[in-house]
């Protein structure tokens, strides 16, 4: 999967720091060496398999240099859940359909933030020219009601009220974001 990610990362032609969170015990030493070979100054952070799409990012964020301006948050998205807890799509449509859907979703998200050098430059210029721009992703969604119960549990932790459910969000947890947001 890292080969696919690097095909998109190659569209980043400006200097950047690469932080990679990997589930501890899930990846081989060969996998880790492949990442190190791609970018020798990579910072690899081993994390627990906890927090779904965002847990590894939150753990890795603690390692990010505070002088960082922008973060590009990526992850390998499959949309199939775990063997002991398959996604709703796997339960409804089966593994093959779910894997196809996951691939399509992943590539759509990646193209939204890294499709080519021109798109990357447009995104970076947007951040540079619009100080109110805090986040850029593939598409905005407003279907928070699907996860309403989980969101309501988290709202007090972040000082948010229930009106937060009516807001839009960047889907797929693949996005550019200002470090200080």
Each PLM stretch: what is its role?
Residues 1-181:
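ER/Golgi luminal nucleotide-sugar-dependent glycosyltransferases, focusing on the catalytic module
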């Amino acid at each position: 999967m890292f080969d696919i990610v690097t095909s998109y990362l190659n569209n980043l032609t400006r200097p950047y720091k690469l932080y990679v969170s990997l589930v501890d015990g899930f990846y081989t030493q060969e996998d880790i060496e492949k990442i190190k070979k791609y970018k020798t100054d990579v910072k690899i952070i081993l994390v627990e398999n906890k927090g779904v799409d965002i847990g590894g990012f939150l753990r890795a964020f603690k390692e990010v240099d505070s002088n960082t301006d922008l973060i590009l948050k990526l992850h390998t998205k499959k949309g199939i859940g775990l063997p002991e807890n398959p996604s709703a799509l796997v339960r409804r449509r089966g593994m093959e359909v779910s894997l196809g859907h996951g691939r399509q979703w992943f590539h759509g998200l990646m193209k939204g933030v890294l499709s080519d050098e021109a798109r990357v430059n447009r995104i970076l210029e947007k951040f540079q020219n619009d100080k109110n721009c805090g986040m850029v992703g593939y598409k905005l969604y407003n279907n928070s009601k699907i996860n309403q119960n989980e969101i309501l549990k988290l709202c007090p932790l972040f000082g948010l009220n229930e009106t937060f459910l009516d807001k839009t969000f960047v889907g797929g947890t693949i996005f550019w974001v200002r470090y200080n947001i």
